[in-house]
Regions:
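Catalytic machinery of carbohydrate-active enzymes
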Residues: 1-293
Length: 293
């Protein structure tokens, strides 16, 4: 209340699922500071998650590929924006440097900050440690701003063209459509592919479902193997392998159009929850209480 907040930065460049879970912060900022200009520092690969968001005025791309010159340009951009309020929701060394570079009069982080990132902040939000579920941790921003009574909404924008594509895909497949994502960033988070195949075959055989397999380009080999295993179990069934063939907007569209999603603890799990599709999440080394949508 003691400063005139006109420019706000959210620094959360990486971690697919966590970016999705932190999107409701934008609605809180819009409620508390309706006239402020809001920017988000985001990695190239995840920029689609925030592009065209109604609560965002600008996304600033963070790229690891550009070397020191790119890094210097990013820090200069952050400094020149003259932000009044900054939230570091990543809490790593690199985001601590970004946060400090803004020279904003108010810089706030989370108790999960490590690698010295907390030193760049004027304060860390209480009850935002690792013992708190991730989605609750990010919503502490809203509570700090006095608007925690709001219903958290991701506010993801799915273009009409992507929705139309997904609708056509679902109609062509026919019946109930179940999306499956067998991948995850950590190997220890990945449920055995054979188990996914058993579930997929059961959905086809017992419920007449069609399957859509999703994932990144790196996961296409795994989804191809999954399709092969499923079709060993059932003589008939529609299984479409879309892994590596969709951007994040199309992924959101197909997950939104599906009747259900079966997935490991991963970014697509949180994206499916954000667009309102029922999710069956498989947690191996993590827990639903801390990491669930």
């Amino acid at each position: 209340d003691e400063i005139d907040v006109q420019r706000i930065a959210v620094i959360k460049p990486t971690a697919f699922g966590d970016v999705v879970q932190s999107l409701p912060v934008l609605g809180a900022l819009a409620e508390r500071f309706p006239a402020a200009r809001v920017s988000w520092v985001i990695s190239e690969t995840l920029s689609e998650l925030v592009s065209d968001h109604p609560g965002l005025d600008e996304w600033i791309v963070y790229s690891r590929r550009g070397g020191w010159r790119s890094w210097g340009r990013l820090l200069a951009t952050l400094r020149n924006r003259r932000f009044d309020l900054v939230f570091d929701l990543q809490g790593l060394l690199r985001t601590g440097v970004m946060t400090r570079a803004t020279a904003a009069p108010v810089r706030i982080g989370l108790e999960t900050a490590r690698e010295g990132a907390g030193l760049a902040c004027h304060g860390l939000l209480e009850d935002s440690g690792r013992q708190v579920p991730a989605h609750r941790r990010y919503w502490r921003v809203a509570e700090f701003l006095g608007v925690g009574h709001l219903e958290p909404q991701a506010g993801l924008e799915i273009p009409g063209s992507e929705r139309a594509w997904a609708d056509v895909m679902v109609r062509q497949l026919g019946g109930r459509v179940v999306a499956m994502h067998p991948g995850a960033r950590w190997e220890t988070k990945r449920w055995p592919i054979e188990h996914f195949a058993t579930v997929g075959a059961h959905a086809i055989r017992e419920h007449g479902a069609s399957l859509v397999l999703v994932g990144s380009p790196d996961e296409r080999i795994a989804t191809a193997r999954l399709k092969e295993l499923i079709l060993r179990h059932v003589t008939e069934g529609r299984v479409e392998n879309l892994a590596g063939g969709t951007g994040l907007k199309k992924l959101a569209a197909i997950l939104s159009a599906a009747d259900a999603v079966v997935t490991n603890d991963s970014g697509p799990m949180h994206l499916a929850a954000a667009v309102g599709t029922p999710v069956i999440g498989v947690f191996t080394c993590t827990t639903a209480r801390r990491s669930g949508p």
